[in-house]
Swiss-Prot record:
It is found in: Secreted; Target cell membrane. This is M-oxotoxin-Ot1a. Disrupts cell membranes, particularly those rich in phosphocholine, through formation of pores. Has antimicrobial activity against Gram-negative bacterium E.coli, Gram-positive bacteria B.subtilis and S.aureus, and hemolytic activity against sheep, pig and guinea pig erythrocytes. Has insecticidal activity against S.frugiperda ovarian cells by opening non-selective ion channels. Enhances the insecticidal activity of spider venom neurotoxic peptides. The keyword Aminoacyl-tRNA synthetase does not apply. Its main location: secreted. GO terms for cellular component: extracellular region; membrane; other organism cell membrane. Expressed by the venom gland. Belongs to the cationic peptide 02 (oxyopinin-2) family. Keywords: Antibiotic, Antimicrobial, Cytolysis, Hemolysis, Ion transport, Membrane, Secreted, Target cell membrane, Target membrane, Toxin, Transmembrane, Transport. One of its GO terms (molecular function) is toxin activity. It comes from Oxyopes takobius (Lynx spider). One of its GO terms (biological process) is killing of cells of another organism.
Amino acid sequence: FRGLAKLLKIGLKSFARVLKKVLPKAAKAGKALAKSMADENAIRQQNQ
């Protein structure tokens, strides 16, 4: 059980490291996606 907890800690640390690398990119992608969705909504409302 102790070994499992150790593995979990190591896994979480590496996961956190990956998240730190990926998060800024994901945030940028999310903003771009939100903006394009908002633009689509605006276009749709104008067409109605």
